[in-house]
Amino acid sequence: MTENINAGIPLGKQVGHSETYDPSHLFPVARREARKSLGLADDLPFSGPDIWNAYELSWLDSKGKPCVALGEITFPCTSENIIESKSLKLYLNSFNLTRFTSTARVKEIIREDLSRVAGAEVEVKILTPEEFTEVTISAPEGSCIDDLELEEEINAYRPTANYLSTGPEETEEELYTNLLRTNCPVTGQPDWATVIINYRGKAIDQRGLLRYIISFRQHEGFHENCVERIFMDILNRCAPARLTVYARFTRRGGLDINPYRTTHAEHFVNLRLARQ
């Protein structure tokens, strides 16, 4: 992130809260800035969404009675911008003392505002309390690599793609780890995630993959940028025929962000994990 971009970001700063609906809180961050460092242009080698879950969504009905809901917001990775997370929190909080005629109206306003700022069509789903039972805790289906013994001591925590390698045998498998930690590029605060990697191709060395994910522990980057870096490093180093990288980050400020990147047709599930 360049300094001039960080200058306008509300994250880590004292920012006033609006008592009523205020879309001016929304702050865009251009995707192209981080993608330049990965050598990515407009012709992306992946597709997929960023799935945001909003757990603190509330507004007033036409008589002033509070309503609560869960929100699911899906941004395409082809959007011009991501939305800075604190700005989205402030935006959603501005609904708290604003009256709306219906849940459908709230959904439409959020969809219109986020689509405008992101620069692409955004999907919004709102779950009312009667639908909360639809949200259940799940787990990845693949093999967890967290208990593998690493042969060498870890002394540095910076992304190192050279840890990634493959063997001669072909396989199709899903691997996951709960050990990803990255850091906010603005505040330096840690972000935690489970990373699910599904691929077909030459078998990825699992110890090397685990060491690679651990190497992000002091890396600074937004969630979306970190996942795209992981995706591109695996794609470039291991050359799978098919690859999907899906990260489920823990929530902050009532929001969690879950980037999904794939080389093939999108078929994703909003897979809520225990730490979320």
Swiss-Prot record:
Q: What is its main location?
A: cytoplasm
Q: Name one GO biological process term.
A: queuosine biosynthetic process
Does the keyword field hold Oxidoreductase? yes
Q: Where does substrate bind?
A: 83-85, 223-224
Instruction: Note the Pfam families from the entry.
Output: QueF, QueF_N
Single Gene Ontology MF annotation: preQ1 synthase activity
Key words of the record: Cytoplasm, NADP, Oxidoreductase, Queuosine biosynthesis
Please name the HAMAP family in this protein's record.
Answer: QueF_type2
Write down what this protein is called: NADPH-dependent 7-cyano-7-deazaguanine reductase
Q: What would be the name of the gene that encodes this protein?
A: queF
